């Protein structure tokens, strides 16, 4: 082969290919290859691996879609598709690139080496990609041909500000179940945009800015077969750490705009931007984004796993119903989820400050979104039990060494067509007595768990369903500190050290259905949705719970200065929430209009010591001979000793809710919830609303029954430099309408035995109730 440049002396140990690719490698399209010159071919030697560098200016793809099978009420299965139309890739200019020559150029780089020790073959893969802005003009759910579609969700875009990095190293094969593998995945500083067009051709955006999912890990990647003892692993792609020595590190990421400042390894920063035109930007000083909420997680986790697979003939969502909501399908053809679907499950154990396994301890962050934002970092994550029964039986009374954890349970993704969807029944609520006047029943019935997707009468919308079954989050944060966004400087930066107070938001056996579809209301693009969500209050032994509790971790001198672990809050929350309606980005707010919102719950207002804690005082019976009496029982969440009162409620009506983002200043960045809840009363599609307070000793009840009327609300949460402020405002009958007067038609007393007695009623024709609370934690 002729070499016109006489450069044969410059040989490479790797194969170097120069190609022009018409689309990013993750998109299932054809690639156009540029013809290689003799000069380029002369550099090929391929002795030591494969090196591919692909650069391109832009790409246009007509349609990208995912198809799924869906059952129907007539027992015939159909095919539905989720279609991204008008897909394009364009430059936006990378800020951080693995190669200076790549800055601003769309590119994919792959470096693959394969080596052998004689007994095994190892693989080393290093790759990076920069795709600029990946945009789809619309997202619709369509029939099998893609010709008949529902309304658009809006337009979607993903914007990369630096390279995506994926590295993998293994010493024995690629999907070897018993071969340890090192993995790096760097999704850093991505921006996600949902753009909806409101009436008047005004574009508004919901944005996840500076998204990070940046981790390194040691573990195993393989495809499980039908012999796996864990059912979720069967016929699935499995990533797991498996052994105690292996781990996942969520590493913090340098802020793309503020050198030397870092955001969480998993960073979900949600903001709102109104009247955007056609621009995709989070850095417009003339139209800054407004913060909504930021969630973050960093640090080392262990006992982690990720499972992904396809599932067949799932009955997880129940039967498909016709538009009348009467006729239900049967068999696979009538199963709402159909014969195909996607499945995922993720779990991990958190580490804490004295058990970090050589890495950084796990931390969680909750903050206002955007810039000029304060937040709170939670750490020292532990289970609910301070000591187990085994620990208390030990003369040394050691602390519980088990780790806090989360487990998403089974998560299913399906395209569906149905009037109703099924949620698993909460037996506690179904068996919890709820007496209203002379009518005795239960808080919920089986019918409450078959909830509506929509209230239309002509046809069911084709929709995306995400179903969660058995999500557990068994973690209590025992240490907390205030934090701020990267742009905050000087005296505005929180300086307080980590403090011994915490927040417990554990939940047990959470089940949920989330249904979404595109729709149009009064000329505005909106998101149709239906929600069903339930939690279980506790398990039988009381070591898992759904609760909202504050923790005081002051030193206990009677327990070697371990934390005292006082708590107060709502515990053992059995809850069911169902709703349907539409969501839109309008008028600088996120609006949810729900024609029907039902909330049913049973819970306890309680305060005391966390299970297994050493009492701070010497109680009767506590002695050296009877040390067990010096500790809170490990099953104390199954007892009534800490309970001030029980609460039962069922509220049913319509709600219009505005989630109002804060303005881009330290003083103004807050999150507000503004709207009204119209309690309808029994009749038609609605049931009676009631709130009942239960005596924990004898079970007698005072009931505020048959509640009707309209309640307006304006509530705000504001995290400051060293305080957390809550503002609540309730307006009764805000429209001053005679038929919307707030009324408790019956105030009843229900003794533990015997018949209930009506005490009277309460009517509020108008008025306002305001409450402001500010918490300033101190050690």
Q: Where are the model-predicted features located?
A:
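Gram-negative bacterial Sec-dependent N-terminal signal peptides
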Residues: 1-35, 44
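General structural concept
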Residues: 37-39
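N-terminal low-complexity, acidic/Ser/Thr/Gly/Pro-rich segments
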Residues: 43, 48-779
């Amino acid at each position: 082969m002729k070499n016109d440049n006489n450069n044969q002396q410059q040989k490479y140990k790797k194969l170097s290919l120069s190609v022009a690719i018409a689309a990013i490698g993750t998109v299932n399209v054809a690639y156009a290859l540029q013809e290689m010159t003799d000069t380029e071919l002369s550099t090929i030697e391929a002795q030591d691996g494969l090196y591919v560098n692909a650069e391109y200016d832009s790409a246009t793809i007509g349609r990208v879609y995912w198809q799924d099978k869906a059952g129907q009420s007539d027992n015939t299965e159909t095919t539905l598709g989720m279609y991204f139309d008008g897909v394009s890739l364009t430059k936006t200019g990378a800020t951080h690139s693995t190669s200076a020559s790549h800055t601003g150029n769309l590119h994919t780089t792959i470096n693959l080496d394969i080596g052998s020790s004689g007994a095994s073959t190892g693989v080393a893969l290093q790759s990076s990609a920069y795709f600029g802005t990946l945009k789809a003009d619309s997202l619709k759910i369509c029939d099998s041909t893609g010709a008949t579609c529902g309304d658009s969700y809006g337009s979607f875009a993903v914007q990369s500000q630096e390279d995506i990095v994926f590295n993998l190293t293994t010493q024995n094969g690629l999907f070897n179940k018993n071969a340890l593998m090192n993995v790096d995945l760097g999704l850093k500083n991505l921006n996600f945009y949902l753009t909806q067009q409101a009436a008047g051709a005004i574009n508004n955006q919901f944005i996840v800015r500076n998204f990070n999912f940046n981790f390194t890990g040691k573990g195993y990647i393989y495809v499980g077969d039908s012999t796996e003892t864990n059912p979720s692993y069967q016929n699935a792609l499995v990533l797991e750490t498996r052994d105690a020595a292996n781990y996942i590190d969520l590493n913090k990421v340098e802020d793309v705009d503020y050198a030397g400042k870092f955001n969480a390894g998993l960073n979900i920063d949600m903001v709102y931007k109104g009247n955007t035109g056609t621009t995709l930007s989070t850095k417009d000083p003339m139209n800054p984004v407004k913060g909504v909420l930021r969630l973050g997680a960093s640090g080392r986790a262990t006992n982690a796993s990720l499972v992904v697979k396809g599932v067949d003939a799932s009955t997880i969502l129940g039967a498909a119903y016709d538009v009348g909501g009467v006729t239900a399908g049967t068999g696979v053809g009538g199963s709402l989820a159909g014969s195909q679907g996607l499945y995922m499950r993720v779990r991990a154990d958190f580490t804490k400050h004295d058990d970090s396994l050589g890495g950084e301890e796990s931390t969680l962050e909750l903050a206002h979104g955007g810039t000029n934002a304060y937040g709170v970092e939670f750490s020292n994550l532990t289970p609910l039990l301070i000591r187990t029964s085994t620990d208390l039986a030990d003369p040394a009374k050691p602390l519980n060494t088990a780790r806090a954890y989360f487990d998403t349970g089974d998560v299913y993704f399906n395209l569906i067509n149905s009037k109703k969807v099924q949620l698993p029944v909460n037996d506690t609520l179904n068996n919890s007595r709820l007496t209203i006047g002379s009518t005795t029943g239960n808080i919920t019935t089986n019918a409450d768990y078959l909830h509506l997707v929509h209230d239309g009468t002509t046809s069911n919308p084709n929709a995306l369903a995400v179903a969660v079954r058995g999500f557990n989050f068994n973690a209590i944060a025992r240490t907390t500190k205030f934090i701020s966004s990267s742009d905050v400087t000087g005296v505005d930066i929180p300086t307080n050290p980590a403090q011994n107070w915490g927040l417990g938001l554990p939940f047990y056996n959470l089940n949920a259905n989330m249904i979404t579809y595109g729709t149009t209301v009064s000329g505005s693009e909106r998101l149709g949705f239906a929600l069903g969500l339930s939690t279980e209050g506790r398990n039988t032994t009381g070591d898992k719970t759904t609760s909202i509790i504050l923790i005081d971790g002051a030193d206990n001198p009677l327990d070697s200065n371990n934390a005292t672990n006082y708590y107060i809050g709502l515990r053992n929350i059995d809850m069911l929430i169902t709703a349907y309606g539409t969501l839109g980005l309008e008028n600088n707010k996120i609006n949810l209009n729900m024609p029907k919102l039902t909330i049913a719950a049973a819970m306890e207002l309680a305060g005391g010591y966390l299970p297994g804690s050493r009492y701070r005082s010497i109680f009767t019976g506590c002695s050296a001979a009877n040390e067990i009496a010096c500790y809170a029982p490990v099953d104390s969440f199954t007892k009534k000793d800490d309970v001030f009162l029980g609460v039962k409620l069922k509220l049913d009506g319509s709600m219009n809710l505005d989630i109002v983002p804060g303005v881009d200043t330290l003083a103004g960045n807050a999150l507000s919830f503004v709207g009204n809840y119209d309690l309808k009363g029994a009749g038609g599609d609605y049931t009676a609303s009631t709130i009942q307070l239960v005596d924990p000793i004898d079970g007698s009840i005072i009931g505020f029954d048959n509640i009707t009327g309209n309640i307006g609300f304006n509530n705000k949460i504001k995290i400051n430099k060293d305080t957390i402020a809550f503002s609540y405002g309730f307006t009764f009958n805000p429209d001053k309408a005679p038929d919307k007067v707030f009324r408790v038609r019956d105030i009843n007393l229900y003794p533990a035995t015997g018949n209930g007695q009506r005490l009277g009623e309460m009517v509020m024709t108008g008025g306002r109730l305001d409450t402001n609370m500010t918490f300033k934690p101190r050690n």
